[in-house]
Structure formats: C-alpha cells, structure tokens
Amino acid sequence: MNGIKKSYAEWVAVDWGTSNFRYWVLESDKVLKHDILPLGMQKLNRDEYEEHLIKAIGNLLDPTKLTPILICGMAGSRQGWSEAPYLSIPSKPPDLRHAMPVNSKDRRISVRILPGLRQSDPADIMRGEETQIRGILDKNKNFDGVICLPGTHTKWVRISAGEVVNFQTFMTGEMFFLLSEKSVLKHSVSKGGWVEKIFRESVNEIITDNKLLGAKLFNLRAEFIMENLSKTESRTRLSGYLIGLELAGSRPYWLGQKVLILGEDDISLAYEQ
C-alpha cells in the first residue's frame, strides 16, 4: 500500500447554479471525482461557498501546491460568492482571460469565477450557460443557429460567427417547481412519472391558444378532486402547459431554425418531443 501514489487534483471545474452545485475534480483528462449537490445559490450565504467546496474536494487537494478552481454560474452573481461582472453581447463566450480572482481562506486553492453575459434590449442575463455554449462552439466551430439550454431558467440563444448575438430566458423550470411544490396544485401532482401522449397534447393545446392558461392550471386540481385525473397525468399536463407556453413565446428562435438542445436527458427529451 505504501507504494501507491495518491492522485491529487490538477484543477477543479465547478458549475455553481441557482439550484445545484456541480463539480469535476480533474487530473489531466481523468475525472477523479464528480458530484451534483443540492447546494445552489438559493440556499447559500456568501460565506458558505468555500466551506462547501472544501468539504467536497478537500481530500483531493495537494497540500504542497496551489490547485486552480474555475467556477461558472451563479457563484459569480451579486448574491453569490463573489461578483464577476457581465460581458455585453454580441460577444464570444468568456474564457480564462475574463475570469475574476476570488479571495479564499484555504491556502491550497486559487479560485477564479467566469463572468456571465448580458443583453440590453430586451434586458436579459445568463450565468453558467455561456460556459456550456463555449464548450459547444469549441467542438462545433462553424455552428450557426440556435442553442436551447433547458433548466430552472431555460435559455434560447442565437449564435452567429462564433458569437452570442441575442438570447431569451424563460422561467419555465422554476414555475414548474413553484406550482408543483408550493401552490394548491402540490396535492394533485406526482413527484415523478410521465405520459407522453398527454404531454404532446398539452403542449399543442397551449401553443395553439394560451389565453386560458390560468384557468387550465386550476382545472388540474378540479379534475383530480373529481377523480378524473391521476397525479401522474396532472404532472404531465402541468409540464406540457408550461413548456407549451415557452415554445409559443420562443417561436422566433426555433421555427425554421437549426436548433441544438443541451441539458439533462429527461428535460432535453421533453423539449425535443
């Protein structure tokens, strides 16, 4: 056992979002450790970021040298660990030259946070997605079209000549969470499950006419109470209604456009359908 050399991180990549803290501990091209923790910006105070980072990766830090930590996402917001000012579009996604240094207490780490992107008219911002976009463009250097990044706040991003030229954000994921977990609908909606046919019907229904969306949402509760709708069916319709509303609003981004969808498998599949 004494002959085995312990592997330490060469550097650590972090995506610190609104809802989750994702990290990858890297040695060359090898991932030593990866995890997703429900410790997003919504749940943390400014002085808690370093504590949770060290708790997650501390045993893989070389005590004899400084390990670079590169962070994107909401850790760089005004309410995050340390603010990294936005770059204005049109712009190429930020790279290491734009990363802002962060003061840390632990002497084993050198922390930098990448800035997000801002759009003046209409006003919009992104943090974290711009780094995902950079990864896409590094692998698809001639990509011109639209990138859809589903999530808590879904982004529709138009790319031309390697630059982000405009984008639009929809709070679809957060609205689904609030309605299914914090509203009167929480008693009528399951925690999981999916009915593809109902989802497609619900999406098309709202794309065609969304004037009565508020009423249709309460219909979910009424139909459940009257035993005409299961919790799984209710969850599916709620998701379909909200994604349908988003697709109706984002039509200029996807209609007749080349679209690349980047996100977790389950939610990306919903958008692809």
Predicted regions and their residues:
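A short acidic Gly-Thr/Ser loop motif
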Residues: 14-20, 74, 148-153, 172, ...
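ATP-binding/phosphotransfer module of carbohydrate and carboxylate kinases, centering on a glycine-rich
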Residues: 21, 26, 184-273
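Glycine-rich phosphate-binding loop plus the immediately following alpha-helix
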Residues: 42-44, 117-209
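Short acidic-glycine loop/turn motifs at beta-strand connectors
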Residues: 26-30, 107, 158-163
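Phosphate/pyrophosphate-binding loops at sites that engage ATP/ADP/AMP, CoA/4′-phosphopantetheine
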Residues: 53-68, 247-255
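Short glycine-rich, Thr/Ser-proximal phosphate-binding strand/loop in the N-terminal lobe
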Residues: 11-49
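Short glycine-rich phosphate-binding loop at a beta-alpha junction
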Residues: 65-77, 151, 243, 256-265
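Short beta-strand-loop/turn "lid" adjacent to the catalytic site in phosphate-handling enzymes
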Residues: 62-126
